[in-house]
Amino acid sequence: MKRDWVKWLLAVAALALAGPVLAQTRLKWAHVYETGEAYHKWALWAADEIKKRTAGRYELQVFPASSLGKETDINQGLTLGTVDIIYTGQAFAARTYPPLAIGGAPFMFRDFGHWKKYSESAVLAELMEGYYKKGGNKPVAVTYYGVRHTTANKAINKPEDMVGLKLRVPDAPLYIMYPKTVGANATPIAFAEVYLALQNKTVDAQENPLPTIEAKKFHEVQSHINLTGHISEMLITIVSGQTWNKLSDADKQSFEAVLKEAAAKATDDIVASETKLVDEFSTKYKKTVVRSDRAAFAAVFQKAHLGPDATWDKALYDRVQAIK
């Protein structure tokens, strides 16, 4: 009897010790991109890597293609506690901290090199910290989303070619700057609804990076790929403040390291894909690829950068432009 009692006590003690090790927290990572895109591929990698580095204590479930809501919804979900991690564009994050929108303004960057240095700069780090202090959610990494181009059923060589065009834009204020400045009619439509809107001719055109145009199959319902190159875009990986604050310091380091590595890997994939797709839209998909007059477009936006729609001041603008 005594021996049985000792065995029981040992079993209870073993379970008590095993409890914390076996405890697992499931986290939701939401985004609006397709499963075939680099962002999703490396989010899945990050989920596996975080599970390994935390000895299975955290399991990330990745929800792609707007399955947990539109981009506006998942941004709100960070604060509501319905999602734990998201990818989002600067314009959406700027609803919380407006100066952050500067990196998503049309023709803000001279080229990819300028964007890359900005993405690694103290300027962006300060803006991310401002976002964190304002809303409590933690930006931990940035991924190159690509250069946004304009698809339509006609050639767009110069800004005047866009006058009166019904252009779908994401539902965030900054994206209105592009159509407004060139005389197009901005039509905000949720990402998941864009293909149908183009097919039904609810809108005439849309704008996105080449990898996204391919992944979302927008080329199926548009004849021209116009290389306007108007926005060099990034996605921000943001962890909900509620989730971030529960992590130990060691786990915070693990999460941040993995998410930054995933962002770097996705960036490499997007850069390679952009280069390849310029030719493939013509040769593989038989689309008309138009090399728009980017200099003419950029000239139109000089005043807009410090106009009434800018959510940043001249001092910040000058710092961004001074990055070499």
How should each PLM-predicted stretch be described?
Residues 1-10:
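Bacterial N-terminal signal peptides that target proteins for export
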Residues 24-114, 123, 130-324:
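N-terminal secretory/targeting leader peptides
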